[in-house]
Design a protein with these regions (language model features):
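Compositionally biased, low-complexity segments enriched in small residues
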Residues: 3-7, 68-71, 78, 82-83, ...
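Compositionally biased non-globular segments, especially hydrophobic aliphatic-rich helices
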Residues: 12-14, 19, 151, 169, ...
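Extracellular adhesion/carbohydrate-recognition regions
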Residues: 19-112, 116, 181, 193, ...
């Protein structure tokens, strides 16, 4: 089962790497340049924001890779909110051949920052909600997110979320998530599967780890 605990590591990780907690003034508009990438929203607990989420530039942080080279169990990597820990768990469990997605994100140095990671399930969902590339109708069977700010207790409607207002992330934009394309989260669903989300209608599924879907690295800073 996904683990809903243990998201509070980013500040310490950034300090350990000699990076500042505040790389820029606090962001106010979805999609604005911030912290080596682009502001994607906030994540928190019980509606209280704890971190700003930052999506990396598409040209350097978006790629197609396998979650794992085999459909076997992973130690850890089951949190829905702690992408840094999930990524660290995979990096510790095997090399880049075993965990291509996690190592790709972990090894990035972009915008002067080296604390990029593979987003956990609820982090990836926030990216979809705020940076949806198309005007396609949404599925209504998923979308609730206890870690969104504000909390979303209900699933999507066909029209909410709408296409993002951030032009660079809309279809055809330089920073868009590939439309109607599957993106891996770092959250393990079972010993053989991991969770992924389709950046079209917002479908959420679990599937075999040894399939190459896209991954988009993110980072976060404390509010």
């Amino acid at each position: 089962m996904p683990n809903f605990s243990g998201m509070w590591t980013t500040t310490q990780q950034m300090q350990a790497k000699g990076q500042s907690i505040w790389p820029d003034p606090p962001p106010s508009v979805i999609g604005q340049a911030f912290g080596g990438g682009y502001y994607a929203g906030q994540i928190g607990v019980s509606g209280t924001a704890t971190h700003y989420l930052i999506v990396g530039p598409a040209s350097s942080t978006d790629s197609a890779k396998k979650w794992k080279d085999a459909n076997t169990a992973t130690t850890g990597a089951d949190s829905v909110i702690n992408g840094p820990q999930n990524t660290a768990d995979m990096v510790a469990d095997g090399n880049s051949t075993v965990y291509p997605c996690a190592h790709f994100c972990n090894d990035l140095v972009v915008g002067g920052f080296s604390d990029w990671y593979m987003p956990a399930l609820n982090e990836l969902e926030i990216c979809f909600y705020n940076l949806k590339p198309s005007t396609q109708n949404n599925v209504t069977t998923t979308g609730a997110n206890a870690n969104a700010v504000p909390v979303r207790a209900s699933n999507y409607t066909t029209g909410i979320p709408a296409q993002t207002s951030a032009v660079a992330f809309q279809n055809g934009g330089s920073e868009q998530f590939a439309n109607s394309t599957s993106y891996w989260s770092s959250t393990e669903a079972s010993s053989t599967d991991a969770w992924f989300k389709i950046f079209g209608a917002g479908n959420l599924y679990q599937y075999s780890k040894n399939v190459a879907y896209r991954v988009r690295a993110i980072r976060r800073v404390a509010v």
